[in-house]
Regions:
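N-terminal, positively charged nucleic-acid-binding surface of large information/translation enzymes
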Residues: 8-13, 17-105, 462-466
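Structural preference for alpha-helix termini/caps and helix-kink/transition segments
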Residues: 268, 275-469
Length: 469
C-alpha cells in the first residue's frame, strides 16, 4: 500500500509504527454553522481510507476533533445572544447528523478543544521550559518559530519565503513578538469571550496547539497518518509539527495526507466567500449516497468541481450498481439451493480478478476513481452471468463481492425494503380506527412501526399526512 506523503512529496510504502495497527488523526470542522459539502470532502475521503485500512486487516484508531472555541463561534454567539458553548454543541450535533447521512462512521474518539485545556497548558509550559515559546507582557504566549530548525518542512518553504508571501497569515500583535513569524499559543481574554485561567493570563488557546494536544492524548507522541484539507498545510499543520516535535522530541506524523478543494465554478467553496451548499441543501435534492459517490469519483488529491450535471451522472452510476445488486438478490431468492458447480467456481475466480483490481487501485494512494471502475467491471461481469441458470450460492457470492467493495467505499447499495403506498395507507387507517376506539397504546405502536420503516406521520386538521424520511 502506497500513500502520497505531503512531507516528502512522493508516494511511499505504508509501514505502520506498530504492526497491524494504524494511528490516524483527521482535523475536523470548526462548529459554528451547518457543514458545507466542501467540509464533507475530507470527512468522506478519510472515512474511506479508514474503511480500506480495516478491510485490509488493520486495527485503526481514528481520531477527529471538533474545534469548539474560535472567533467565528464567538461571533455567532454574540449575534444570537447566547453562550459560545450553545453554538458549538448545537452544530456538533448537526454535524454528526450530516456525517451519519453520508455514512461517515463516527471516529474512535471525537475530542473537543474546550475539554482538553489542561493538556494545552501542559504542552505550552513544556515549550516555554525548552525555549521554544515565551510569554509577552500581557500574557500572550508565542511560539518562537526560528527556534525550530525544521520549520517549513511540510509546506516546503523556508523562512525567507514566509517573511514574504505567507507573512500576513502569521503576523498579529507584532509589537510584542520577538519575531514577526512567531505565532500564538495562548491569547488573553476579551470582553464577553469564554476564557480559562492559566499561569500566563485568563484567556484561551490558539488554534494550532489544540490539535497537537488532542493528537498526543488519544494517539501518543508519534502517529502514522495526519490528514486534512490542503488549506491546512500552512500554517496549521506546519505549526502542529513545530509544537509537537519540539515538545515531545519525536517525529510527529509519519505520513501527511491532504485532499484537494471542492470547487464551484472553479473557485474554492467556502462560507466566507458565500459560494457554498450545505450538506443539508444537497441531501434534500439527492440521495446522500449520490453525494458520497460524487466525492469518490475523483482522486482525493485532484480538485473536484461541483455541478448538477456531475451529480446526475453520479446518481445514474450509483443506480446501476444498485440495480445489479437487486437483480442478484432476486436471482438468489429464486435459484436452486445447492452447492457451487465447478463452472461457477471458475466464474467466481474470474470475479476475484476484479476484486484484485479494486485492491490495486486503493493500494495506489487510495485511487477511488479506479476502484469504483473496478466495481463497475464486476457489475458488468455479473450482468453477463445473468442469462444462465446458476445456484443460489453463486448469485449470493457475486452479490457479496459487489456489496463488500461498495461498503469499503462507504456506499450503501442494497435498497431497504420499502412499504408500498397502499401498505402505508392501510396502517394509517388501522391507527385511525384504534384512536377512535381509544386504544391509544396500539395507535402509538403503529406510529412507531411506521417511523421504524422510514415513514413520518403528521396529524393535521385535514387528516393524517405522511412522508418518507
Amino acid at each position: 500500500m502506497k500513500i502520497y506523503n505531503t512531507l516528502t512529496k512522493k508516494k511511499e510504502e505504508f509501514v505502520p509504527i506498530e504492526p497491524g495497527k494504524v494511528r490516524m488523526y483527521v482535523c475536523g470542522p470548526t462548529v459554528y454553522n451547518f457543514i458545507h459539502i466542501g467540509n464533507a470532502r475530507p470527512m468522506i475521503v478519510f472515512d474511506t481510507v479508514r474503511r480500506y485500512m480495516e478491510y485490509k486487516g488493520y486495527e485503526v484508531n481514528y481520531v477527529s476533533n471538533f474545534t469548539d472555541v474560535d472567533d467565528k463561534i464567538i461571533k455567532k454567539a454574540v449575534e444570537e445572544g447566547v453562550d459560545a458553548n450553545v453554538i458549538s454543541e448545537r452544530y456538533i450535533a448537526e454535524c454528526k447528523k450530516d456525517m451519519a447521512s453520508l455514512n461517515v462512521r463516527p471516529a474512535t474518539t471525537h475530542p473537543q478543544a474546550t475539554q482538553e485545556i489542561c493538556g494545552m497548558e501542559e504542552m505550552i509550559r513544556t515549550l516555554i521550559e525548552k525555549g521554544y515559546a515565551y510569554a509577552a507582557e500581557d500574557g500572550t504566549v508565542y511560539y518562537r518559530v526560528r527556534s525550530f530548525k525544521d520549520y517549513g518542512k511540510l509546506s516546503h518553504k523556508n523562512l525567507d519565503d514566509l517573511e514574504g508571501g505567507k507573512r500576513s497569515l502569521l503576523v498579529s500583535g507584532a509589537d510584542q513578538k520577538e519575531d514577526p513569524l512567531d505565532f500564538v499559543l495562548w491569547k488573553p481574554k476579551k470582553e464577553g469571550e469564554p476564557f480559562w485561567k492559566s499561569p500566563w493570563c485568563d484567556g484561551r488557546p490558539g488554534w494550532h496547539i489544540e490539535c497537537s494536544v488532542m493528537s498526543k492524548k488519544y494517539l501518543g507522541d508519534e502517529i502514522d497518518i495526519h490528514a486534512g484539507g490542503e488549506d491546512l498545510i500552512f500554517p496549521h499543520h506546519e505549526n502542529e509539527i513545530a509544537q509537537s516535535e519540539a515538545a515531545n522530541g519525536k517525529p510527529f506524523a509519519h505520513y501527511w495526507m491532504h485532499n484537494a478543494f471542492l470547487n464551484i465554478d472553479n473557485h474554492k467553496m467556502s462560507k466566507s466567500a458565500g459560494n457554498f451548499f450545505t450538506v443539508r441543501d444537497i441531501v434534500a435534492k439527492y440521495d446522500p449516497m449520490v453525494l458520497r459517490f460524487f466525492m469518490l469519483s475523483a482522486h482525493y488529491r485532484s480538485p473536484l468541481n461541483f455541478s448538477a450535471e456531475l451529480m446526475e451522472a453520479a446518481a445514474n452510476s450509483l443506480e446501476r450498481i444498485r440495480t445489479a445488486v437487486a437483480t442478484l438478490q432476486f436471482k438468489a431468492q429464486n435459484a436452486e439451493d445447492s452447492e457451487l458447480t465447478e463452472q461457477e467456481k471458475e466464474l467466481l475466480a474470474q470475479a476475484a480478478g476484479f476484486e484484485a483490481k479494486f485492491d490495486q487501485a486503493m493500494d495506489d494512494d487510495f485511487n477511488t476513481a479506479d476502484a469504483i471502475a473496478a466495481i463497475f467491471e464486476l457489475v458488468k461481469f455479473a450482468n453477463t452471468c445473468g442469462d444462465a441458470e446458476h445456484t443460489k450460492a453463486f448469485w449470493e457470492a457475486l452479490k457479496e463481492k459487489i456489496t463488500t467493495l461498495s461498503d469499503v467505499c462507504g456506499l450503501i447499495v442494497e435498497k431497504k425494503e420499502e412499504l408500498l403506498d397502499a401498505d402505508v395507507e392501510a396502517l394509517i387507517e388501522e391507527r385511525q380506527a384504534t384512536r377512535k376506539a381509544k386504544n391509544f397504546a396500539r395507535a402509538d405502536e403503529i406510529r412507531q412501526q411506521l417511523l421504524d420503516m422510514g415513514i413520518v406521520l403528521e396529524d393535521t386538521r385535514e387528516g393524517v399526512k405522511w412522508k418518507r424520511a
